[in-house]
Amino acid sequence: MDGFIIINKKENMTSRDVVNIVCKKLHTKKVGHTGTLDPMAKGVLVIAVNKALKLVDDITSLNKEYIAEVTLGIKTDTLDITGNVLEKEDITNINKEFIEEVLNSFIGEYNMEVPIYSAVKVNGKKLYEYAREGKSVELPIKKVVINNIELLSVDQ
């Protein structure tokens, strides 16, 4: 079989877990994906099988859409909800208009330092492995383009 499989990845699974399952089910080792989703993330994971692997770079260069849930006023050591809370801040006077203004400031093209808790590899090793070992490493810079951003709802 050659082609793509669209999988709705569940929470608490790595993208690699999904690839391994597909490898076993299809009895092939030529399986990959078009982009890692964090283990706590759920959503579409595009799986490429055999000859379709040649098209992965073309697909990863396309625009993507994300829906994210954000908790304001908390900073963690992993930059996500799974980490240890380092700081808490009172956000009672932050309103919807302010949040929309901040979100809109992200629209455009810019360079972003890749977070240390990331599957991006440096010297053949995933950044989150360096972070878990307490080792510092020069973080790569990635070009980011945000064409549109929309606030769907605010819960108090």
Language-model features and meaning:
Residues 1-156:
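Catalytic/RNA-binding core of pseudouridine synthases
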